[in-house]
């Protein structure tokens, strides 16, 4: 996916759009949107990856206000799977932490998907086409990953992950 959007579960009327900007070298951009009544307004575009970006996924942490994680393939870094923590402050101000590589095998992170644990702050699960899964941990503005675990020996095409809200 080259554009994803999600509502912020912690702030009424706020959502985030993450996309690649094909007019600017396919760089990765994020934009906060706000819905008020029947009107939509947007903040400024913020770049999280200046190089060629694709296969985006994004999720808000339902337990930590204003925090989200974006994952993507970074073609400006040999196509590695990369993650970055974002924060929203005020109405539309987005800041990003440092980028973290979660899979250094180029072309193995197509179609990744992430989901935060619904009852544990700062923890999420990431799966990707390589048939691998990781647990991600957000600390401040950085993210770290557990060693990857294989969940299928084949190619896991369009993987999607959801977290069990009862655990």
Regions found by a protein language model. Name each.
Residues 1-167:
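Extracellular, repeat-based ectodomains that mediate carbohydrate processing or recognition
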């Amino acid at each position: 996916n080259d554009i994803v959007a999600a509502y912020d579960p912690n702030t009424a009327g706020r959502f985030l759009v993450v996309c690649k900007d094909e007019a600017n070298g396919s760089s990765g951009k994020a934009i906060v949107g706000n819905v008020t009544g029947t009107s939509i307004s947007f903040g400024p575009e913020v770049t999280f990856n200046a190089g060629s970006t694709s296969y985006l996924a994004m999720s808000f942490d339902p337990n930590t206000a204003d925090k989200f994680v974006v994952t993507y393939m970074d073609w400006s870094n040999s196509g590695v799977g990369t993650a970055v923590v974002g924060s929203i402050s005020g109405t539309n101000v987005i800041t990003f932490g440092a980028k973290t590589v979660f899979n250094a095998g180029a072309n193995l992170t197509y179609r990744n998907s992430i989901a935060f644990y619904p009852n544990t702050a700062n923890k999420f699960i990431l799966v990707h086409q390589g048939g691998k899964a990781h647990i991600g941990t957000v600390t401040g503005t950085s993210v770290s990953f557990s060693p990857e675990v294989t969940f299928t020996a084949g190619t896991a095409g369009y993987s999607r992950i959801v977290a069990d809200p009862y655990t």
